[in-house]
């Protein structure tokens, strides 16, 4: 598979994300994958598979709309919007979060992925007591 084919497969994987698709991860990610996001750092394919399984376990759904893909020699950049619903956040209402991913390839598979998104907007602002505090702090920081 080529780097471009892997990238297309990754986009399709995220746009139709659910736990039944986790078996596709070895076709997309290198066995030495290092995935970094605001939650933490996850090293190795088995660890990344478990991380996805845990994330999806309690979600009502989680899907991505990829709005931009830029491919370079051994790198790529994605811009995306994640739409998700979790019973513990906002009473299970649909949530939306924009973010981006930087990808690096080795042997036509993704060996490094860093996801950038606002963890406050995703989680902290949605929690009952903490959310109002975070929003007040953000308001104070505005000019």
Residue ranges of each PLM-predicted region?
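Short, aromatic-enriched amphipathic alpha-helices that serve as compact interaction elements
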Residues: 2-20
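Hydrophobic alpha-helical core bundles mediating ligand binding, dimerization, or RNAP-core interactions
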Residues: 10, 14, 29, 52-55, ...
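Short, charged helix-to-loop "capping" segments that act as catalytic/coupling loops
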Residues: 18-21, 87-89
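A beta-strand edge to alpha-helix "cap/lid" segment located at domain peripheries
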Residues: 57-63, 70-143
């Amino acid at each position: 598979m080529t780097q471009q084919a892997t990238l297309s497969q990754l986009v399709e994987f995220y746009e139709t994300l659910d736990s039944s698709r986790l078996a596709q991860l070895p076709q997309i990610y290198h066995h030495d994958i290092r995935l970094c996001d605001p939650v933490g750092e996850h090293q190795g394919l088995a660890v990344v598979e478990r991380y996805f399984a845990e994330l999806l376990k309690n979600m009502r759904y989680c899907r991505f709309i990829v709005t931009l893909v830029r491919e370079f020699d051994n790198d790529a950049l994605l811009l995306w919007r994640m739409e998700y619903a979790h019973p513990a956040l906002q009473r299970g209402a649909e949530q939306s979060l924009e973010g981006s991913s930087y990808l690096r390839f080795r042997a036509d598979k993704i060996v490094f992925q860093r996801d950038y998104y606002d963890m406050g907007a995703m989680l902290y602002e949605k929690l009952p007591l903490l959310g109002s505090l975070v929003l007040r702090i953000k308001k104070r920081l505005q000019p």
